[in-house]
Design a protein with these regions (language model features):
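Conserved beta-strand segments of alpha/beta enzyme cores
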Residues: 110-112
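Flexible "cap/lid" loop of the alpha/beta hydrolase fold
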Residues: 1-15
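A short, basic/aromatic alpha-helical/loop segment that forms part
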Residues: 10, 94-95, 125
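Acidic/histidine metal-binding catalytic segments
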Residues: 26-41
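Catalytic histidine-centered segment of alpha/beta-hydrolase-like enzymes
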Residues: 116-131
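C-terminal alpha-helix
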Residues: 133-141
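An amphipathic alpha-helix signature
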Residues: 13-21, 36
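Conserved serine/cysteine hydrolase catalytic core
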Residues: 43-106, 115
C-alpha cells in the first residue's frame, strides 16, 4: 500500500474524496458524502496540502509485516477461550480470507461475527452490520 503513512499530494478534502474510491479497492456502493467524511477523518487540510491524521510510523510496521515470516497465530486466538470475541469482516477483504474467518468461527462458535457486504479491509464501523456486532460484543462484557 503505497499510501499508508504518507501524506498525499492532494491539496483539499474535495480532491481526496474524489480519489478515495480509486485507492480503496473493494469498497463498492459508497456514497460521495461518505468519501468526504473519510477524507476529513483521515487528513487535515493545511496551506501545504493534506496531512495524515495518524502516526506515519505505521508505515514501517506495515511494511515490515510483509517482509516477515508469518507467525502461527492460532495459539494466540485459542488463548482467548472464555473471553468475548467478535469479528467484523469486510466481505471483499484481501487480508482476512473467508477460510480464515470460517476457521475462527469453527474454533469459537460463540464468537460474534458480522460480514459487511461491499466492504474491504477494514469495513466502516458505523454501518448496520458492524454496529450490531459491536453492540453484541459490548453486551457480553462483564
Amino acid at each position: 500500500c503505497a499510501y499508508v503513512g504518507r501524506n498525499p499530494r492532494l491539496k483539499t478534502h474535495e480532491e481526496a474524496a474524489a480519489a478515495l474510491p480509486h485507492v480503496m479497492e473493494g469498497f463498492a456502493n459508497v456514497p460521495e458524502s461518505r468519501w468526504r467524511e473519510e477524507a476529513e477523518k483521515h487528513y487535515v487540510q493545511t496551506p501545504e496540502g493534506l496531512k495524515i491524521t495518524y502516526d506515519p510510523a505505521l508505515r514501517e510496521a506495515f511494511l515490515s509485516a510483509f517482509g516477515a515470516e508469518l507467525a502461527e497465530m492460532w495459539p494466540c486466538f485459542d488463548a482467548l477461550a472464555g473471553k468475548p470475541v467478535a469479528l467484523i469482516r469486510g466481505a471483499n477483504s484481501e487480508l482476512l480470507s473467508p477460510a480464515t474467518a470460517a476457521e475462527m468461527r469453527r474454533r469459537r462458535p460463540d464468537m460474534i461475527f458480522a460480514e459487511v457486504p461491499d466492504r474491504a479491509h477494514i469495513p466502516f464501523l458505523d454501518e448496520p452490520e458492524s454496529l450490531a456486532a459491536i453492540r453484541a460484543f459490548l453486551e457480553r462484557l462483564p
